[in-house]
Amino acid sequence: MVVKAVCVINGDAKGTVFFEQEDNGAPVKVTGEVTGLGKGLHGFHVHEFGDNTNGCMSSGPHFNPHSKEHGAPGDENRHLGDLGNIEASGSGPTAVNITDSKITLVGANSIIGRTVVVHADPDDLGKGGHELSKTTGNAGARIGCGVIGIAKI
């Protein structure tokens, strides 16, 4: 059974991101567009809470139910919410086109109800050697966010 979700991102960065999972255990396709980004890479993560009462800051840390270190999307040792980077050209909207086999839209570790956060800086994928590399990817300020909600199929 196909499950779909949507996230409307607000802040300095704005956009709409769609999530689609064909079946339980299937990869999740993440597509959409984000505007308001400077040229370059920007960290793109799912954070633990669907709470935006204090802007993006109340969304908590990266979604990490297995208590792992921060990493790249293809790493075995990564937070579930680690979706890597999106790349902005500096003009026009930035396309989001990610397929991830670790996140899910169903079950106990579903990302529905959690927050997508777009960061000001590149995610170093846990390999930057900075004190924040293994927790946040040293991706900088939270410049846009939105709660992931169930979408009509």
UniProtKB/Swiss-Prot annotation:
Compartment annotation: Cytoplasm
Positions annotated to bind Zn(2+): 62, 70, 79, 82
Disulfide bridge partners, by residue number: 56-145
Pfam families (alphabetical): Sod_Cu
UniProt cross-references to InterPro entries, sorted A to Z: SOD-like_Cu/Zn_dom_sf (IPR036423), SOD_Cu/Zn_/chaperone (IPR024134), SOD_Cu/Zn_BS (IPR018152), SOD_Cu_Zn_dom (IPR001424)
Reaction catalysis annotation: 2 superoxide + 2 H(+) = H2O2 + O2
Gene3D superfamilies: Superoxide dismutase, copper/zinc binding domain
Self-association and partners: Homodimer.
Function description: Destroys radicals which are normally produced within the cells and which are toxic to biological systems.
Protein name: Superoxide dismutase [Cu-Zn]
Organism encoding this protein: Drosophila willistoni
Lineage: Eukaryota, Metazoa, Ecdysozoa, Arthropoda, Hexapoda
